[in-house]
Design a protein with these regions (language model features):
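Short beta->alpha connector loops
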Residues: 38, 72-74
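Serine hydrolase/lipase
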Residues: 94-130
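Short, aromatic/basic amphipathic alpha-helical patches
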Residues: 43-48, 75-83, 160-165, 184-189
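AMP-binding/adenylate-forming
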Residues: 54, 61-71, 132-142, 146-203
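A short, gly/pro- and small-residue-rich
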Residues: 74-108
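Conserved AMP-binding/adenylate-forming core of the ANL superfamily
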Residues: 1-19, 118-146, 150-153
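Conserved AMP-binding/adenylate-forming
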Residues: 13-52, 144-167
Length: 203
């Protein structure tokens, strides 16, 4: 499932947004910023980095930038006014489409769903480079054991942490610290059969 959606997103970024369809030589968008759920952020950021896109921390878009969001509010409106591309993606699991007016944005799930399930573009750069860029100089604070770990979501380096653990053959449980209180961590680790414990990253 994960590989299918990573491929769909990578195909969309390259074939729909970064393609020079008319051979004009004009600059194509290669910058993206998101306000999504952690699991959605992970997929978008890993796919974008693998295709050479820049992940923006700023909320000041330029024409041609891509903004993917769960909320169509003033931020999305400002991005559209600037000339950025805006995709609306529902926050709920198992959603198939955006439920409500799009107000100039595009339905993110509908756009992605039309893409092939396998890469139809040139092989992306090695994921090692994408991982290292996403980790921004951080590393696990202690040796990691087990086959399944938990990570506290960090908006800046979370996607890199997930990719780092995936590349070492581990499955990952993403915990949003804004939605889960610390006293529930032990229960979550047990319920999710996390044998590698909670992994933290630091410089």
């Amino acid at each position: 499932m994960v590989s299918r959606w990573l491929a769909k997103i990578a195909n969309y970024l390259t074939n729909e947004l970064a393609a020079d369809l008319f051979g004009t030589g004009e600059a194509t968008p290669t910058r993206i910023y998101t306000t999504l759920q952690p699991w959605q952020d992970t997929l978008w950021q890993i796919a974008a980095r693998a295709m050479g896109w820049e992940i923006l921390d700023t909320r000041r878009p330029l024409p041609g930038d891509l903004f993917v969001t769960n909320i169509l509010g003033s931020e999305a409106s400002d991005a559209l006014d600037t000339g950025a591309h805006v995709l609306a993606q529902p926050a709920q699991y198992l959603s198939f489409a955006w439920d409500g007016p799009l107000d100039g944005a595009l339905d993110g799930l509908a756009e992605i769903a039309m893409q092939p399930d396998a890469l139809v573009i040139d092989t992306p750069p090695l994921l090692v480079q994408a991982r290292d860029e996403a980790l921004a100089g951080t590393r696990p604070s202690a040796p990691v054991q087990g086959s399944r770990v938990a990570l506290l979501w960090d908006a800046r380096t979370g996607a890199g942490q997930v990719l780092d653990q995936w590349m070492q053959g581990r499955s990952v449980v993403i915990i949003d610290p804004h939605a889960v209180s610390p006293d529930r961590l032990t229960q979550i680790l047990a319920t999710e059969d996390v044998d590698g414990g909670l992994v933290t990253y630091q410089r």
